[in-house]
Amino acid sequence: MTDTQVTWLTQEAFDRLKAELDQLIANRPVIAAEINDRREEGDLRENGGYHAAREEQGQQEARIRQLQELLNNAKVGEAPKQSGVALPGSVVKVYYDDDENDTETFLIATRQEGISDGKLEVYSPNSPLGGALLDAKVGESRTYTVPSGNVVKVTLVSAEPYQG
């Protein structure tokens, strides 16, 4: 995330990401010790273990920075309790351009919410589609602009709290 934006997270997702961050930070001395051990093995130009440990450290530090930025800019809330309104944490069903046969069901949330089963697509509330649907009521139509510049009409068929 290069630009600062608020990310909606449930308390559960926030806690899970915070635990991951804490574990990565606690692991820093282990990686540093591994690098030191590998450095003592001799010539660094031909030391695969040293380079692998440095690569692992770089990946770990990048993930730490990503999690810190995400958590610092997170808005923590609970999944919506009500049905019928498209909110972050809602599973919505929509149809496009007045074609009731062209439906799609997805979750309005962030990928950090941890949907790992792959059965449910996730659209961010900050995306053009997610943003257009926010606070829409069942039966309401909205429009949004896709990256190609076309304007698409979307109608909310249903909105239910995610039961993940």
Curated annotation (Swiss-Prot):
Alphabetically ordered keywords of this record: Coiled coil, DNA-binding, Transcription, Transcription regulation
Coiled coil regions in record: 50-76
The family this protein is said to belong to: Belongs to the GreA/GreB family.
Organism of origin: Mycolicibacterium smegmatis (strain ATCC 700084 / mc(2)155) (Mycobacterium smegmatis)
Pfam families given in the database record: GreA_GreB, GreA_GreB_N
Transmembrane stretches, start-end: none
Any single biological process term in GO: DNA-templated transcription elongation
A Gene Ontology molecular function term of the record: DNA binding
Tagged with keyword DNA-binding: yes
UniProt protein name: Transcription elongation factor GreA
Source organism superkingdom: Bacteria
Gene label: greA
Alphabetical list of InterPro entries matching this protein: GreA/GreB_C_sf, TF_GreA/GreB_CS, Tscrpt_elong_fac_GreA, Tscrpt_elong_fac_GreA/B, Tscrpt_elong_fac_GreA/B_C, Tscrpt_elong_fac_GreA/B_fam, Tscrpt_elong_fac_GreA/B_N, Tscrpt_elong_fac_GreA/B_N_sf
Function summary: Necessary for efficient RNA polymerase transcription elongation past template-encoded arresting sites. The arresting sites in DNA have the property of trapping a certain fraction of elongating RNA polymerases that pass through, resulting in locked ternary complexes. Cleavage of the nascent transcript by cleavage factors such as GreA or GreB allows the resumption of elongation from the new 3'terminus. GreA releases sequences of 2 to 3 nucleotides.
